[in-house]
């Protein structure tokens, strides 16, 4: 829900967001890069949890199934946590495997705006945060919220890049479409340098 409204935002840009595209360039953060070498964790690797958001964009049947084996990290605003808890309990979700991460969001597209997981040069599982390619400030804050919640190292760049446009094999090969070049106001070489840092 966009800033508490009852309308879910689409995966694409709304007309209002198109008019506010310039806000994206103000949402980024920049920290020191992680210590080298960095290994990007592939999505298909063994994991301990899954990140979702309330109101949900997936069925509670799927959430219930996930909760049998993994932790379900659920981004939820403080004023909606009781509702989320009730719905999950009434749907047979294993509540011992639900961990609420408190904070507002704008949409349920967590794969696009959520954290990117890496193993940094200190062998710490850490979060890499890229600026979300939508003017949705609450969504853009999700990786930092997760880092604070889990107390894991956090590394950010103001490079605009959506998680849905990124795949890695976890062994040093990654792929994205040219969208990452089109959305940033820097050269392709500079984008590549940031991604390889």
Regions found by a protein language model. Give the residues of each.
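The feature marks the mature, well-folded catalytic cores of soluble enzymes
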Residues: 1-197
């Amino acid at each position: 829900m966009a800033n508490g409204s009852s309308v879910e935002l689409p995966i694409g840009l709304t007309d209002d967001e198109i008019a506010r595209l310039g806000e994206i360039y103000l949402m980024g953060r920049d920290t020191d890069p992680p210590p080298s070498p960095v290994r990007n964790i592939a999505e298909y690797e063994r994991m301990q949890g899954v990140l979702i958001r309330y109101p949900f964009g997936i069925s509670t049947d799927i959430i219930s199934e996930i909760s049998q084996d993994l932790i379900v990290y659920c981004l939820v605003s403080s004023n909606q946590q009781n509702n989320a808890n009730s719905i999950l309990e009434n749907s047979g979700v294993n509540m011992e495997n639900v961990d609420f991460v408190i904070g507002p969001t704008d949409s349920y597209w967590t794969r696009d705006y959520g954290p990117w997981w890496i193993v940094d040069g200190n062998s710490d599982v850490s979060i890499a945060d890229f600026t979300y390619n939508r003017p949705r400030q609450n969504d853009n804050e999700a990786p930092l919220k997760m880092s604070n919640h889990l107390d894991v190292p956090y590394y950010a760049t103001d490079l605009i890049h959506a998680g849905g446009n990124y795949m890695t094999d976890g062994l040093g090969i990654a792929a994205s479409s040219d969208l990452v070049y089109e959305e940033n106001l820097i050269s392709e070489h500079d984008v590549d340098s940031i991604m390889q840092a």
